[in-house]
Amino acid sequence: IRDRSPSRGLGDVYKRQSMASIPEIFGSMVFDDVSMKERLPKQTYKALKKTIELGEALDINVANIVANAMKDWAVEKGATHYTHWFQPMTGITAEKHDSFINPTDDGRAIMEFSGKELIKGEPDASSFPSGGLRATFEARGYTAWDPTSYAFVKDDTLCIPTAFCSYTGEALDKKTPLLRSMDRISTEALRILRLFGDEETTRVLTTVGAEQEYFLIDKKLYEKRKDLIYTGRTLFGARAPKGQELEDHYFGTIKPRVSEYMKDLDQELWKLGVFAKTKHNEVAPGQHELAPIFTTTNLATDHNQLTMEIMRKVARRHGMVCLLHEKPFAGVNGSGKHNNWSLSTNTGKNLLDPGKTPKDNAQFLLILMAVIKAVDEYQDLLRLSVASAGNDHRLGANEAPPAIISMFLGDELTEILDSIENNSEYANKGSVRMEMGTVVLPNIKKDTTDRNRTSPFAFTGNKFEFRMLGSALNIACPNIMLNTIVAEAFCEFADELENAEDIRTAVMNLIKREYKEHKRIIFNGNNYSDEWVEEARKRGLLNLRTMPEAMRYYIADKNIGLFMKNSIFTEPEVHSRYEIQLENYTKVLNIEALTMLDMAKKDILPGVSAYVKELTETANAKKALCADIPCDAEIDLVKKLSSLTVCFSKKIAALEQALLGTKEVEGVQELADYYKDHVFAAMQELRAVADEMEINTSSKYWPYPSYGQLLFGVYD
């Protein structure tokens, strides 16, 4: 009998807690505003709030008081260490743990934590990706406390969210440019609001809710697959007899083992202040989704990194493994991450809410037009912000949006903008109620537009849903790009409108002009269709199918100019990110190729050969017993597998040759192109032969768990 207890330690304590206790546990491991107010002197609390809300410098005396209160709180929660928790350009989080203990004169220890230790840390910067910003011998780097993101206790450690920079001041992380972009869009959005008489708002915040898809598989099966262990995805594997064809998994009943995992996951995330809201089965067998309530972008980024970490950790407690790779299994849907992005004022207004009469809401229409302009002019930046080796498997595969950037606005907003362009009257259809055909069901108010799940960038009522992100991606990069390009559009609009005599007329004229220039980016149809690919080409839209194609645009003059003008990146910071991401792409493919060779030579070839030997011995035994006993089935299968084995050996040699060729290639872009065109192509050919061999080989001899076992193994 398998032990399916969902948790150990603290997880058991609240596993069965009632829903009424959620407010008590929510944020219990976070040093949030409530904790600050309770534990800090009134003046210290006010000073810290000014730092958080207005960006004022934090006095060291205030920092010392905050640090001591934070330490006392953390120790009460069981913490013995602290860490500056940051997000280097690896895309995952990093942490170095230091204990609170300090020696006393009598040889004993006390627990101390100073303001200096809170504000600044010094991790080794040479061991993280820097893209040439730091040489190996230039090791000094700094972490700086981000007070806008709350500290929390995890695994008996006080985690302090921080930014990470080099000794010379260059950003070496994801958070620093994200915070810069948030400042930039706030500044420019305020200029837009002032045009419409809003003098009350002092800050505009971008908010994000990141829907996280993932797979769950049995841990014992996972441990038998080298490819999953080394790369996070299956490099070989014939399709299971059943996949997602019946469409019976999406929103289906959650199986007990998965349900227990989800309950435990919710509890862990709630303790850390993550607003985990929705959970359900996704399309593919073994695939699921968790969606949070939106929050400010830097906090949402921290929360999503925490969510992915906790997902993996909790899964292992349940005897499962959480796969966050974008395409762990061929033949079924991969996993993405929808980035729900909006703009809110510090007074609580959603600037992307069209209101009841959007045609009369000039402020909303101007902001909408700025987003349209931004997405059209900087398609390349949005595309490259989601580029990765893993995401290349998803985009354009009829399971995720294509690699072509377009926007879905829906019928109502498109018709309003068309009417402005054509100087025509917009015919408001008004609200419609749906007749359900039976008296027992209520008449439901129908939305003004349908949803388009194939669109990469869709307006969904009061936010934009950017759907191209891969499941493993750090959401900082796409949000840096979104914030920056929209800030640039706001800036251009404000420059033009601030001197206008009649603001409404000037706004409508601007919208008319800009819509005519940028409406090519709007497409409300089927983004999966071949017809759209051709139509997009005619419209002049980019179709950057792979990461190496997209990354070239990172260092385009117009994009470097944009980043520098808005103080998001310096030119060296742009080049460093370009190089780091291309290097990561080639390293990922190299690891995958080496793993395939290891599996092919050490496991698959010997396994198939052993099966061929058994078939041969069976045929010979039949003939020895009686010459009249037919052996056609064994002989035909031996011939087929022998032929496949010869082909497989040739494909192994071809992949080895392709890898040798990488040594002759110079330049990060050229090397990435080579891996895409030669190494990956050889990997695909090797896999095709192996999958055919698997179909024809006894499961007794096939060295790895099958797709059927992996995808359906958590339901037994």
Model-found features: residue ranges?
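Single conserved hydrophobic/aromatic residue that forms the stacking wall/gate
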Residues: 1-17
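Flexible inter-domain linker/hinge segments
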Residues: 15-34, 187, 191-193
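Active-site core of metal-dependent hydrolases
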Residues: 25-139
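Active-site proximal loops enriched in glycine and acidic residues that flank catalytic Cys/His/Asp
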Residues: 62, 86, 114, 292-294, ...
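Active-site-proximal loop/turn and secondary-structure-junction residues that shape catalytic pockets
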Residues: 62-66, 86-88, 116-117, 164, ...
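Short linear, low-complexity motifs centered on an aromatic residue
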Residues: 91-106, 126, 225, 232-234, ...
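Glycine-rich, acidic/polar active-site loops that bind/position phosphate-bearing ligands
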Residues: 139-324, 333-336, 343-579
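C-terminal amphipathic alpha-helical interaction region
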Residues: 511, 516-716
